[in-house]
Every structure is written in C-alpha cells, then in structure tokens.
C-alpha cells in the first residue's frame, strides 16, 4: 500500500513544511510589526525570586495563611471600587467573575497583579480576575467581607432610626 501512496505522502509532508514556514513568517512578522502582546511579552517586568526568598515564602505557618487571604480579599475588594460597586460575584475553577455597577471605579490591572492576581479581563461592566486554584477560599473571604460590611450598614441604619 505504501508503494501506491508514496508520492501522496511525500507531497503532504512537503505541503506541511511549506505551511509551517509560511505560518512562522507571517505570525512572526505580525507580532513584531504590531508589537502584539503574547504570553511572555507583557510590558510589566517579571520579578525573579532568590532561593532564600522562595524558602522564606514556603516557611509560613498555616495560621498566617487566612490572614494573608483576608488581606488579599480586602485589597481586591478595594481595587474593585468597594462593596457598593459590586453587583454580583461568581467564580469558576481559577477566576473571580464580578459584575460591577461602574467599571470606572476599578483600579489599574497592575494593582490586581500586585495583590496576587495572574491577570484581569474586562468586558462591559464585568471583570474577571484570574486568581488560580485557591479562588474558592478567596471568594469565601470576599463574601464574608461583603456580608460584614452589609451587616454593619444595617446596624447603622437601625441605630439611626
């Protein structure tokens, strides 16, 4: 059977190599000409950690982790424009999906990255903050912060009446 289709197989290999070369040249030219951001070509600098910094970050006790998550949740809540700007919060395996009342109240993407987010996507009045696999714990902390803020508002309203 090989003898019957050898020419066809060689032709397909040649076509595949030609298209590989064509794709490489076209996409490399487009990426370099228009300075398209691809993974690894962001404007922000990547911070490299030393071995001592890595070991210090892994040496934390488990009691410090909830405090760290609470601080991260509070920072993200402030970066989103506060409790009053949030319409709804949802999450998937790695992302926080948040519907906002006013997108202009949110802070820059770099603020989210400094708070531990891997990236941010904005679309209309919705924002997706890429957190990672610990997004469910962060969501619980956000929910508790929002609930405590709302209960504090309710107490203030009842005291005013």
Swiss-Prot record:
Q: What's the EC number here?
A: 2.7.1.-
Question: Gene3D superfamilies from the entry?
Answer: Glucose permease domain IIB
Q: Name one GO cellular component term.
A: plasma membrane
Q: Where is the PTS EIIB type-1 domain?
A: 70-152
Q: Where are the transmembrane segments?
A: 10-32
Membrane protein topology class:
Single-pass membrane protein
Cellular compartments annotated: Cell membrane
The principal location of this protein is membrane
User: SUPFAM superfamilies recorded for this chain?
Assistant: Glucose permease domain IIB
Q: Which GO terms describe its molecular function?
A: kinase activity; protein-N(PI)-phosphohistidine-sugar phosphotransferase activity; protein-phosphocysteine-sugar phosphotransferase activity
One GO BP on record is: phosphoenolpyruvate-dependent sugar phosphotransferase system
Any idea which residues are catalytic in this one? Answer: 92 (phosphocysteine intermediate)
Q: Which UniProt keywords apply?
A: Cell membrane, Kinase, Membrane, Phosphotransferase system, Sugar transport, Transferase, Transmembrane, Transmembrane helix, Transport
The domain section of the record reads:
The EIIB domain is phosphorylated by phospho-EIIA on a cysteinyl or histidyl residue, depending on the transported sugar. Then, it transfers the phosphoryl group to the sugar substrate concomitantly with the sugar uptake processed by the EIIC domain.
Role played? The phosphoenolpyruvate-dependent sugar phosphotransferase system (sugar PTS), a major carbohydrate active -transport system, catalyzes the phosphorylation of incoming sugar substrates concomitantly with their translocation across the cell membrane.
NCBIfam families recorded: EIIB_glc (TIGR00826), PRK09702.1 (NF007255)
Q: What is this protein called?
A: Phosphotransferase enzyme IIB component GlvB
The protein's gene is named glvB
């Amino acid at each position: 059977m090989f003898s019957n289709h050898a020419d066809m197989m060689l032709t397909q290999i040649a076509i595949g190599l030609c298209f590989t070369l064509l794709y490489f040249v076209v996409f490399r030219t487009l990426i370099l000409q228009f300075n398209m951001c691809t993974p690894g070509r962001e404007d922000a600098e990547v911070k490299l950690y030393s071995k001592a910094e890595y070991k210090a970050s892994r040496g934390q006790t488990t009691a410090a982790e909830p405090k760290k998550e609470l601080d991260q949740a509070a920072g993200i809540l402030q970066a989103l424009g506060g409790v009053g700007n949030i319409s709804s919060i949802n999450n998937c395996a790695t992302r926080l999906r948040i519907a906002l009342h006013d997108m202009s109240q949110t802070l820059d993407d770099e603020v989210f990255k400094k708070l531990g987010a891997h990236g941010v996507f904005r679309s209309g009045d919705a924002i997706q903050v890429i957190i990672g696999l610990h997004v469910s714990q962060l969501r619980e902390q956000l929910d508790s912060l929002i609930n405590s803020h709302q209960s504090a508002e309710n107490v203030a309203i009842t005291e005013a009446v």
